[in-house]
Every structure is written in C-alpha cells, then in structure tokens.
Design a protein with these regions (language model features):
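The feature marks the mature, well-folded catalytic cores of soluble enzymes
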Residues: 1-235
Length: 235
C-alpha cells in the first residue's frame, strides 16, 4: 500500500510537468487471494527449470501459487513496456482482471498483451528484458521458440540463462535469519513470505541507459560477455 510513496517527489514533479498519474484500485483482500498451484503436494513434478533453480540456490525451490480472479491484482513489475505495447505476465503477481483493468485505463492508444506460459512465479524482469527496439533478452530456462510471446515474432532474440549462483552471503542470511523468523511467524498462525527468495535469474534484470548502454550486476560475468558480443557498452 505504501511502497510507491517513496516515489512521490518524482511523481509529483512529473505530474506538475503535464504527465498523467494513474494508480490501480486497492484490493480489499478480505479473502484468500492465493490459490494452490498444484492440486496437492503429490502432484508436484520438478521441471527442468526447477532443477536448474535448485543448482543455483543451494537446493531451494520457488514457492508457487496462483491468484484468484475476485479482484484486480497486479504489481507494476508484472509488465514490460515497448513503446505503445505492454507485455503482461499472468502469474502469482498479476491476474487476468489486472490486465483487463490496465487495458481499460490505457485505452486504444496502448495495447496490453498477456502471457502465462513463460514463468509461473512473480514479476517479468527475470524472464524478459527489452534491450532496444527489435532486440530482446530472454531467459532460456523458461522461454523457448514454442512459448515465446508472439509480440517478439519479428524481434531478434538473445537466449540466456547462465547467471551467477545466488551468493553465499544471501543464502546464509536466508537460512540463519529469514527462515527461523518465518517459522516463528507460522507458529503464531500468520502467513509470511520470509521463506521466499528472489530468483537467481534476477541477475538478468539490467537497466538500459540508452540503446547502446546497460547497467549490469558485476557478478553476472557471462551476461556481460554476451552483451559485449552484441556491441553494448557495459557499466
């Protein structure tokens, strides 16, 4: 509810300069908005992505769930914008109602494209990164030629998945601090996301400064090499 408040000084500056400022409806969440991803625990089958995830995170698996379609639910990181087109990931961080609301607000000037086959968890920025018009970076642990969103049919594609493993310091904090606190919270009868860690592929979440310059995590040496090979300046 209050995360976006940190950006208010910037948003007000934009607003005073003529920008439109819209915000999604706040959900009531007076029900269980999370639905089981699998029918039951016995239905879980590890995918190739799951196995790769375990190797990169010391054996951990992502906790998966789906969102109910009772209210508009989505996070901004669930979308990536390419000019007048937006790609929206239907996932644990955005439901179909969210995509419908976004299209209704943006109107005919923008087109909202949905995908739900490329990533089962939250946010799109560890799966799809648009580097410049006509060139996209795709997480090959999730995206293939078969399930690649149609919006990229005419784009050049860089498939990549060889990110650096989750750091030992991050794993140590998770095991020694977050996990124990999470268990205590569960014992009190509350739910918590303290058991969840960022995907190791969040290392693909670079920042484009312009069409030739990108800011990349210095640990992601393989990604840096790929981008340099494709004539990008790396910061």
């Amino acid at each position: 509810y209050y995360e976006s408040a940190a950006l208010y000084p910037i948003l007000y500056k934009y607003f005073q300069n003529g920008f439109k400022w819209i915000a999604g409806p706040k959900p009531l969440l007076n029900y269980d908005s999370s639905l089981p991803y699998y029918r039951d625990g016995d239905a879980i089958e590890l995918t190739d992505e799951d196995v790769k995830h375990q190797k990169l995170t010391g054996g951990r698996l992502e906790k998966l769930h789906k969102l109910a379609e009772k209210e508009i639910l989505f996070e901004a990181a669930n979308t990536v914008r390419m000019g007048k087109d937006l790609l929206y990931l239907i996932s644990s961080s955005g439901n179909k109602l969210g995509a419908q609301w976004l299209q209704s607000v943006l109107g005919n000037e923008y087109r909202v494209h949905t995908t739900e086959d490329i990533y089962r968890s939250s946010h799109i920025d560890s799966t799809v990164m648009c580097l410049r018009p006509g060139l996209v970076l795709l997480n090959s642990a999730r995206v293939t030629e078969k399930n690649c969103p149609k919006i990229f049919d005419k784009w050049d594609k860089l498939y990549f998945e060889d990110v650096a493993p989750t750091s030992e310091s991050e794993l140590k904090i998770q095991k020694e601090i977050r996990d124990p606190i999470g268990h205590k919270i569960n014992e009190l009868g509350f739910k918590t996301n303290l058991f969840d860690m960022s995907s190791p592929w969040v290392g693909m979440n670079l920042l484009s400064y312009d069409q030739e310059t990108v800011l990349v995590d210095e640990r992601q040496e393989n990604l840096i090499k790929l981008l340099e090979k494709n004539k990008f300046n790396i910061v």
